């Protein structure tokens, strides 16, 4: 179920303050955050936010098409290395 419209988007307060300071200064420094649950709002457009994926921070450049999504959607937590392929050349008898 999506969040109620009357509540508005959820953004962690510390992240919102960092974005507001960057907008006020007019700079575009990388903002590091652990808040994967925060929603992307129009104030974040053009910023690069480093989202934690469990072991490192993944830089995410915010574009218009990302508004309304959550930051965690753009920093995958699991690495899929593929299924093991049968090696028929190495099985010579």
UniProtKB/Swiss-Prot annotation:
Q: Which GO terms describe its cellular component?
A: cytoplasm; small ribosomal subunit
Example of a GO MF term: structural constituent of ribosome
Q: Name one Pfam family in it.
A: Ribosomal_S19
Q: Which residues form a coiled coil?
A: none
One Gene Ontology term of the biological-process aspect is: translation
Q: Which UniProt keywords apply?
A: Ribonucleoprotein, Ribosomal protein, RNA-binding, rRNA-binding
| Stated family | Belongs to the universal ribosomal protein uS19 family.
Function recorded in the entry: Protein S19 forms a complex with S13 that binds strongly to the 16S ribosomal RNA.
Name assigned to this protein: Small ribosomal subunit protein uS19
Q: Which organism is it from?
A: Kocuria rhizophila (strain ATCC 9341 / DSM 348 / NBRC 103217 / DC2201)
């Amino acid at each position: 179920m999506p969040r109620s419209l009357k509540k508005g988007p959820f953004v962690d307060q510390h992240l919102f303050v960092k974005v507001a300071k960057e907008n006020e200064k007019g700079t575009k420094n990388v903002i590091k955050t652990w808040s994967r649950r925060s929603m992307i709002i129009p104030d974040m457009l053009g910023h690069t936010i480093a989202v934690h994926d469990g072991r490192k921070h993944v830089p995410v450049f915010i574009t218009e098409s990302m508004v309304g999504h959550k930051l965690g959607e753009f920093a995958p937590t699991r690495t899929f290395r593929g299924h093991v392929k049968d090696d028929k050349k190495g099985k010579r008898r």
